[in-house]
Amino acid sequence: MTAKFLPVLALAASTLSPALAQNTPYSAAGKQAQVYTTAQGTGQRLAAGPALSFQPAAQPAETQVCVFVDPAHSFQTLLGIGGALTDAAAETFAKLPKAQQQEFLRAYYSPTAGIGYSLARTHIGSCDFSSASYTYVKEGDASLKSFSVKHDEQYRIPFIKQAMAAAGGQLTMFVSPWSPPAFMKTNHDLLHGGKLLPEFRQAWANYYVQFIKTYEKLGIPIWGLTVQNEEMATQKWESCLYTAEEERDFIKEYLGPTLKKGNLGDKKLIAWDHNRDLLYQRASTVLDDPAAAQYVWGIGYHWYETWTGSSMLFNNERAVKEAFPNTNLIFTEGCVESFKLDQVNEWRLGERYGNSMINDFNAGTVGWTDWNVLLDETGGPNHVGNFCFAPIIADTRTGKLLYTNAYYYIGHFSKFIRPGAERVATTTNRDWLQATSFRNPDGKVAVVVMNSGDKPQEFQLWVKGQAASTTSPAHSIATYVLN
C-alpha cells in the first residue's frame, strides 16, 4: 500500500458539544452514491462498486424495504475513531520487518491507502497488555521526585510518534490509568483491585499531571484523560476500585482542581470508563453534582457488559443523553476476548464491531476507540494471560500481518466518516438492516448499512423524496458516500 499522509482535522472543543437536532437543507436530486462493500464469502473488503444514481421516488409502501436518511436533521459532531496504542502493540510492532511496519502504519492511519484513524488511547503505567507490571516512581515516593517514563521510551513512545506521523502529525490522544502505585493502595498491590488510600489522593492526582506534562515535553500532545480504567472490576491484572461517590469526590476535590492548578484545565476529563450496564447510575452520580460536573467533559464506556449474558445495553447510553444532553459520550474500549489464532477469519469479529458502532453513534456517541491496534500470534503479549483479538494480528514468526474482518468493519466508519462530521437522522424499516449516517465537513454524506442476516436484502436508499435501489449481501457492511 502507498499513500500520502494527510493531516487529521483538529477539532475545537466548542464543536463537540452535543445538541438537539438541527435543520440544514439538503437534496439528493442529481446526486450519486459511491458504494464500498465488505461481504462474507466474497473477496470484497472495502471494495468499490458501481455508483448508485438517485431518482425521484413516490411514497414507499410498507412492503418496500428502505433505509431512510434525512441530512437536514443533524445531531452530535464526531471527535474521531481509532484504537489504543499499548505496550503490547508497540512491542509487537517493533518485532516486524520495516516493510510491514510501514504497511501497518498506512493501513491504520492513512485516510487514502488505509482507514484513517484519528483517535487514540494509551495507558498511564502498566496494564494487562504490558509484558510486566511497572510504575513511574520508586516505592514510597509520594513526592514523585523519582518520576520517569524511561520504561515507555523503549517501545511505546517511539511507536506513538510513528502513528502520529502517519496520521499527518496529529492524533487526538487520551490516557487512562489501570492502577496507582502499590504503596498508594489499600491492598499494596498493582493487581487484584484494591482502592486508593485517602492519604494519597493528592499524590495520585499529581501523578496524572506529571504524566501528561512529561509526555507533552516528549512531543506527544494529550487531549484528555479518564479517571480510572474499569472502576468496578477486581482484575487479576492492574486495577483499582471506586464507587460512584468516590469517583465523584476524587474528581471535585483532587483531580479536577489539580489539573486546573497545573494549567491542564483544558484537558478533557472522562468519567466512568467501564461497561454500559452501570452507565447511567455512574454518570448521574457525577453529573448531578455541579462541583464535580464542572470538570467533566464526558462519560466513557466499554462493551463488556455481555459477560453477564446480556446483550449490549445501548439504551443506557440514550438514557444518559436524555438526562444530560450537554455531556459527551465516548466509547473508550472494546475487543473480542479469548484469542485463538485459528479464529482470526471468523465473521463474528467484525459484526460485533458493526453492531456496536452503529448503535453507539445512533445513541449520541462522539468518539469510538477500539482496544489494542495490534497484537501478536498469541493474542498478546499480556503478562497475565488475558489474550484477545485485535483488528490486525502480526505473526511475528513470519513477519506477516493478518487482517481480521474487524479491521474492515471499523474502516467502513473511520475511512468515510471524518472528524467534524455531524450525525444525521437515519432509520430502517426492517430490523435486520442497521444503519447510521454522517454529513462530513466537505458536505458528503456517508451512510453505513449492515446486514447481519443469512440472506441478501434488496432495499431503497431513500433521501427526502429521492431513492436509489441496491442490495445488501448476507453478512455484509457497506458505506454509501453521497457526493
Please give the residue ranges for each predicted region.
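Bacterial Sec-dependent N-terminal signal peptides
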Residues: 1-28
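Aromatic/acidic polysaccharide-binding cleft in carbohydrate-active enzymes
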Residues: 328-409, 425-428
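Carbohydrate-binding surface patches
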Residues: 415, 426-464, 475
